[in-house]
């Protein structure tokens, strides 16, 4: 919330701002349970992004505020949970998310997308 408060006023009228969320923050895609605090924090972040995007559209209708899921990225945090999933290097995840940001227009402001551009359910 503090990042949005301080940086949204600086956003160009056609600019984009993306926040890192996670697929586990999706209520509609929760089929495994667990991770209560992490899921709740990412779901709250998604609500914050959606709400702020509505308000941003009033003053900067061509700007974009997005919630992005980077996928499983190789890191100490993901190490215990990777299992059979294919974790990707952080630089690849970042490059893919930049492509998603560039591909999404203002009509997608406030939306939740994965690194491959797939729209994710709230």
Label each residue range with its predicted role.
Residues 20, 59-71:
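Conserved beta-loop-beta element that borders a ligand/cofactor-binding pocket
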Residues 63, 67, 75, 80-122:
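C-terminal helical subdomain
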